[in-house]
Amino acid sequence: MNALETQGLGMIPMVIEQSGRGERSYDIYSRLLKERVIFLVGPVNDQTANLVVAQLLFLESENPDKDISFYINSPGGSVSAGMAIFDTMNFIKPDVSTLCTGMAASMGAFLLAAGAKGKRFALPNSKVMIHQPLGGMQGQATEIEIHAREILKTREQLNKILAERTGQPLEKIQRDTERDYFLSADESREYGLVDQVIHRRS
């Protein structure tokens, strides 16, 4: 996330640092990136996925042995964009610790659960929502049928990964994701989407 991409969030604060070579200013997100903190705020789409993937790869090149913190407040969005982030999280060497602030819904919840085991967190008043992938298609009947088959395959793929990440039986995941399934922070921990609800930084 850079200053151009976050203009919709309002004014971007700047941080000024003093050094022996003078002053240097950063937008707040660039400063936090130096501390290995990445944000996903808003919809998951090709643009946000591109930024997250680039930051993950950059931080791996900076230090492949140090954890990356990934803060999520997202209503979800594109499955293919989300899977690009998911695959990169698994591809890189550093552990990616996830933390839900506000709401992690749909693909946002999927990415929250994708964090390194034991390093997935939620703040106490955050919410999580899981459901099956959504799709819409217009065109000839044959094209609609092809897309329907593809979305069913995608649903099966996502459910299998969620079952693996949460420890829940696949049948329960299939049942729960039939409709929007909302969980509080504590319920998310019990479900296995996160490992811990944190009230205060230790």
Swiss-Prot record:
User: What is the reaction catalyzed?
Assistant: Hydrolysis of proteins to small peptides in the presence of ATP and magnesium. alpha-casein is the usual test substrate. In the absence of ATP, only oligopeptides shorter than five residues are hydrolyzed (such as succinyl-Leu-Tyr-|-NHMec, and Leu-Tyr-Leu-|-Tyr-Trp, in which cleavage of the -Tyr-|-Leu- and -Tyr-|-Trp bonds also occurs)
Query: Which EC class is this protein assigned?
Result: hydrolase
What are the UniProt keywords, alphabetically?
Cytoplasm, Hydrolase, Protease, Serine protease
Task: Name the family.
Answer: Belongs to the peptidase S14 family.
Which compartments does it reside in? Cytoplasm
> Any idea what this protein is called?
ATP-dependent Clp protease proteolytic subunit
Q: What the protein does?
A: Cleaves peptides in various proteins in a process that requires ATP hydrolysis. Has a chymotrypsin-like activity. Plays a major role in the degradation of misfolded proteins.
What's a Pfam family this protein contains? Answer: CLP_protease
Molecular function terms from GO: ATP-dependent peptidase activity; ATPase binding; serine-type endopeptidase activity
Q: Where is the active site?
A: S106 (nucleophile), H131
- The gene designation is clpP
Chief subcellular location? cytoplasm
Q: Which organism is it from?
A: Verminephrobacter eiseniae (strain EF01-2)
Superkingdom is: Bacteria
GO CC aspect terms = cytoplasm; endopeptidase Clp complex
